Swiss-Prot record:
It is found in: Cytoplasm. This is Thiazole synthase. The keyword Plastid does not apply. One of its GO terms (cellular component) is cytoplasm. Belongs to the ThiG family. The active site is at K102 (schiff-base intermediate with dxp).
Length: 263
């Protein structure tokens, strides 16, 4: 397979990069932009409730990235039910014309930040029917992933570990099960702590990785962003190449034929 043409397709959108980055937790918009460009990402997600991308009277992310081709992905972080998220995205589309969205409805706002999948399922169906391209954040349940796909989700975004935890991929088998269960892209979201975590996610067969805290809170965000760029590429190529099977015992890499005989 020619990896040069190996693009990521989400709904009607096509991207060359399989890394998606967040915009939160940076010290300023300048660092956000520098790190995002270093990552090679073509999608940046922004929590509309925390950063008002619709405010034209002050510095905002839309203004910061206006000279780039980066696609904005508004998300509903902070929403706790379907009604809040639906209302938010309708306002976003009315103000910006953006209908490419990350649906994130949190069930446990105080501790785990785990998603409320029941509310998410309801919101996905309504928003998809209204023409939104819904990327649905969810838990690592392949049954729910399939239900979200059936409800109209254009991509499934299972968590790898709690948001911002940096614990890495805690559910390798479930990520694989989700990949088998759905036909839409699977984007590993939440829990990535370093570049190797992103690479592992891609080696498991994920179509893309979203990370924010691992870059924004790194000692050098720009350098970490570049590391993530290459990690995602390496993981994807490794997945496409096909790893060797795991074995319990050794297997010589050099042929035994023609060896010199002694004694």
């Amino acid at each position: 397979m020619n990896h040069i043409k190996d693009t990521l397709k989400i709904g009607s959108h096509t991207f060359a990069s399989r890394l998606i980055v967040g915009s939160g937790k940076y010290k300023d918009f300048a660092t956000t932009k520098e790190a995002t460009l270093a990552s090679g990402a073509e999608i940046i997600t922004v929590a509309v409730r925390r950063v008002n991308i619709m405010d034209n009277k002050s510095e905002n992310l839309l203004e910061t990235f206006k000279d780039t081709n980066i696609q904005f992905l508004p998300n509903s972080a902070g929403c706790v039910n379907a009604k809040e998220a639906i209302t938010l995205f309708r306002l976003v589309r009315e103000a910006t014309g953006i209908d490419f969205i990350k649906l994130e409805i949190i069930g446990d706002i105080d501790k785990t930040l785990y998603p409320d999948v029941i509310e998410s399922l309801q919101a996905t169906e309504i928003l998809a029917n209204e023409g939104f391209c819904v990327l649905a954040y969810t838990n690592d349940d392949p049954i729910m992933a399939k239900r979200l796909e059936n409800a109209g989700a254009s991509a499934i975004m299972p968590l790898a570990a709690p948001i911002g935890s940096g614990l890495g991929i805690q559910n390798r088998y479930n990520i694989g099960f989700i990949k088998e269960a759905v036909k839409v892209p699977v984007i590993v979201d939440a829990g990535v702590g370093c570049a190797s975590d992103a690479s592992i996610a891609m080696e498991l067969g994920a179509d893309a990785v979203l990370t924010n805290t691992a870059i924004a809170q790194a000692q050098n965000p720009v350098t970490m962003a570049e590391a993530m760029k290459y990690a995602v590429k390496a993981g994807r190529l490794s997945y496409l190449a096909g790893r060797i099977p795991r074995k319990a015992y050794a297997s010589a890499s050099s042929p035994l034929e023609g060896m010199m005989q002694f004694g």
